[in-house]
């Protein structure tokens, strides 16, 4: 399980970061 999480974690971060960046720009 740890190996799968190690692979998923970076992918989830890359998938979430753009969404968070858009939200921050909208708040500005």
UniProtKB/Swiss-Prot annotation:
Keywords from the named record: Toxin
Post-translational modifications reported in the UniProt record: Processed by the macrocyclase-peptidase enzyme POPB to yield a toxic cyclic octapeptide. POPB first removes 10 residues from the N-terminus. Conformational trapping of the remaining peptide forces the enzyme to release this intermediate rather than proceed to macrocyclization. The enzyme rebinds the remaining peptide in a different conformation and catalyzes macrocyclization of the N-terminal 8 residues.
Cross-link Cyclopeptide (Ile-Pro) per UniProt, renumbered positions: 11-18
Molecular function in Gene Ontology: toxin activity
Residues cleaved off as propeptide: 1-10, 19-28
Function of the protein: Probable toxin that belongs to the MSDIN-like toxin family responsible for a large number of food poisoning cases and deaths.
Record-stated family: Belongs to the MSDIN fungal toxin family.
Protein name from the UniProt record: MSDIN-like toxin proprotein 8
The species this protein was found in: Amanita bisporigera (Destroying angel)
């Amino acid at each position: 399980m740890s190996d799968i999480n190690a692979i998923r974690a970076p992918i989830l971060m890359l998938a979430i970061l753009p969404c968070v960046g858009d939200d921050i720009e909208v708040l500005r």
